[in-house]
């Protein structure tokens, strides 16, 4: 997979190629899926599989170990959700699949996608995350859950307490594996793995493939199929990107107020770089009598869930947040993203913006830039070979 002499450096830049025997299956119909799963996929609004879905679903369903290098916005969650649902034996009321992810939000998101796609299959899927009631976990797991989606610490705790029985587990999914390692979950992932039956199939999804990840794949996997979704398939296509030049930081606020009526045509997400800025901006918008909701990593879990629920249901139309939201949280109606602050790195840009026009849905992104930000913006533009123009007056017509 990597040239030997590259072992010492970060392997994320090594040419990671898709395995030669990977077939591209162009439609969901051609994947030989269960009838009720297929109906669930179409009911969810999917029409055509994304690049990663065309390549990964079939090998996973066939039981192969798979390493997929893919970022959010590629349809990765639905990729393994569909594969899991196809592989399940719903008549067996035991945990057969375990999904681990780096954040509570993502674990919940995965559960929602699985339940939505498996709506006609009578599937049981439980979320196992910290900050929730232990008794509830025990009751739910006792009842029998086909799939458990959770964060590594809580899942390991449940296995150790023998509340989560692993004897029927046949698949382990590691989503955003690089993020899990960044958050220090390496030990817990290894701990969980040790409790699983030896023949467990492993599916690993990661945006980058640093040495630690490759080390993990060599320990957990047998002859894995590799699937790389190149960045050009992480689309900024169909997303119109603009910038508004402001001379001073304070002027961003006035610009946002001017845009408020445009924002509420659909639903909008506004990104700030810090939690303090989110709180400050939310407060200031409310003082000016604008209705907004906000979310960041310091809020209690319950509150974050509540806010996400309202936003998903369309009860709140403008959400101010930090990058905690940008990874893997999918709200289909969002067609406008505003970077109140330009992100601190190029990858975050596609995580924030690449959400709004998923799978052919159109979107608009507006970047607020001070003069010293223009350089960063041009760098982003070049990196993704995309175009970011000055915002036109009629921006409302584009949304």
From Swiss-Prot:
Keywords, comma-separated and alphabetical: ATP-binding, Developmental protein, Helicase, Hydrolase, mRNA processing, mRNA splicing, mRNA transport, Nucleotide-binding, Nucleus, RNA-binding, Transport
A matching Pfam family: DEAD
GO CC annotation: catalytic step 2 spliceosome; nucleolus; nucleus; pole plasm; precatalytic spliceosome
Main location: nucleus
Reactions it catalyzes: ATP + H2O = ADP + phosphate + H(+)
Motif (DEAD box): 175-178
Residues the entry annotates as binding ATP: 70-77
Any GO BP annotation: RNA splicing
Motif (Q motif): 26-54
Location of this chain's protein in the cell: Nucleus
Its EC number(s): 3.6.4.13
Record CDD domains: DEADc_EIF4AIII_DDX48 (cd18045), SF2_C_DEAD (cd18787)
Domain Helicase ATP-binding: 57-227
Sample GO molecular function, one term: RNA helicase activity
Effect of residue 150 to S: In allele eIF4AIII-19; homozygous oocytes are non-viable
Residue span(s) of domain Helicase C-terminal: 238-399
Functional note: ATP-dependent RNA helicase. Core component of the splicing-dependent multiprotein exon junction complex (EJC) deposited at splice junctions on mRNAs. Involved in exon definition of genes containing long introns, including the rolled/MAPK gene. Has a role in oskar mRNA localization at the posterior pole of the developing oocyte.
Assembly and oligomerization: Part of the mRNA splicing-dependent exon junction complex (EJC) complex; the core complex contains btz/CASC3, eIF4AIII, mago and tsu/RBM8A. Interacts with btz/CASC3 and mago. Interacts with ncm/CWC22.
Family: Belongs to the DEAD box helicase family.
Name by which UniProt lists this protein: Eukaryotic initiation factor 4A-III
Organism encoding this protein: Drosophila melanogaster (Fruit fly)
Taxon lineage: Eukaryota, Metazoa, Ecdysozoa, Arthropoda, Hexapoda
